[in-house]
Amino acid sequence: MSITAERKQELIKKFAIKEGDTGSPEVQVAILTERINNLTDHFKTNKKDNHSRRGLLTMVATRRKLLDYARSKSEARYTKLITELGIRR
């Protein structure tokens, strides 16, 4: 199941640095985390869906790169982000 527009707006509002911010690493990581969690649930019932699994691996790699960038810019914001999203790193 895809992420809904309402849920995406909630994530943007929660993690935005300033009004109208949709491109900061925090917002991008939050949206990717939501999509990754949805795909993880999808794989519990569709174990052989290898096409979507490749997309999942791409999303995880993108999220990891964004997290590395966020960490290089501000350790405090990075720590707050992974704590709020429940990501283990």
Curated annotation (Swiss-Prot):
Keyword terms of this UniProt record: Ribonucleoprotein, Ribosomal protein, RNA-binding, rRNA-binding
Q: Does the keyword Cell wall biogenesis/degradation apply?
A: no
Q: For this protein, what is any one GO molecular function term?
A: rRNA binding
**Cross-referenced Pfam families:** Ribosomal_S15
Describe the family membership recorded for this protein in Swiss-Prot or TrEMBL: Belongs to the universal ribosomal protein uS15 family.
What's the protein here called? Small ribosomal subunit protein uS15
Signal sequence coordinates: none
- Biological process (GO) annotations? translation
Query: Do you know which HAMAP family this protein is assigned to?
Result: Ribosomal_uS15_B (MF_01343_B)
Q: What InterPro entries does the record point to?
A: Ribosomal_uS15 (IPR000589), Ribosomal_uS15_bac-type (IPR005290), uS15_NS1_RNA-bd_sf (IPR009068)
Query: What are the annotated GO cellular component locations?
Result: cytosolic small ribosomal subunit
Kindly give the CDD domains that the UniProt entry links to this protein: Ribosomal_S15p_S13e (cd00353)
Does the keyword section mention rRNA-binding?
yes
Q: How does it assemble?
A: Part of the 30S ribosomal subunit. Forms a bridge to the 50S subunit in the 70S ribosome, contacting the 23S rRNA.
Function per UniProt: One of the primary rRNA binding proteins, it binds directly to 16S rRNA where it helps nucleate assembly of the platform of the 30S subunit by binding and bridging several RNA helices of the 16S rRNA. Forms an intersubunit bridge (bridge B4) with the 23S rRNA of the 50S subunit in the ribosome.
Q: Which PROSITE patterns match?
A: RIBOSOMAL_S15
